[in-house]
Amino acid sequence: MIWKRHLTLDELNATSDNTMVAHLGIVYTRLGDDVLEAEMPVDIRTHQPFGLLHGGASAALAETLGSMAGFMMTRDGQCVVGTELNATHHRPVSEGKVRGVCQPLHLGRQNQSWEIVVFDEQGRRCCTCRLGTAVLG
C-alpha cells in the first residue's frame, strides 16, 4: 500500500460535506493499494446545456480524486495543492454515472503527478486527465 495516511471510505466521503464535491454528487467508492476511485452522477448538476456531461464536471471529478490521493501521500503538517490539470475528452455521456480511477504517475517529495481516467457505466474511457500537485509543508 502506498498511502501514508490511512483513511476509510466513510472518512474520505465525510471530507466532502458542504463542498462542491458533495454538490456534484461525487462519492469515493474504492481505496485500493495504489488506486482511489469515485463515482459521479451524470444529471442536471453535471450536464452542459446540450444534455451531455460537462467537461468541467469531469475535470472536477479528476481534481477531486487526484487532490485527495495526493493528500493521502503526505505526512502530518503537509498538504497538497493542484498546479496543473489536463483533460482529454474522448466520448460523450448523457446519463447514468461515471467512475473516476486515480493512480500515481510520479510521487516525489515536492511534487506528484496523477492519472485519472473517467469511465462510463459500460466501462468505456470517456476522459483522461493528468493532475500535477505540489507538496507544501
Curated annotation (Swiss-Prot):
Listed name of the protein: Proofreading thioesterase EntH
GO terms of molecular function: 1,4-dihydroxy-2-naphthoyl-CoA thioesterase activity
Cellular component GO terms, alphabetical: cytosol
Catalytic site: E63
Pathway: Siderophore biosynthesis; enterobactin biosynthesis
Quaternary organization: Homotetramer. Dimer of dimers. Interacts specifically with the aryl carrier protein (ArCP) domain of EntB.
Swiss-Prot/TrEMBL keywords: Cytoplasm, Hydrolase
PANTHER family from the UniProt entry: 1,4-DIHYDROXY-2-NAPHTHOYL-COA THIOESTERASE 1, PROOFREADING THIOESTERASE ENTH
CDD domains named in the record: PaaI_thioesterase
Gene: entH
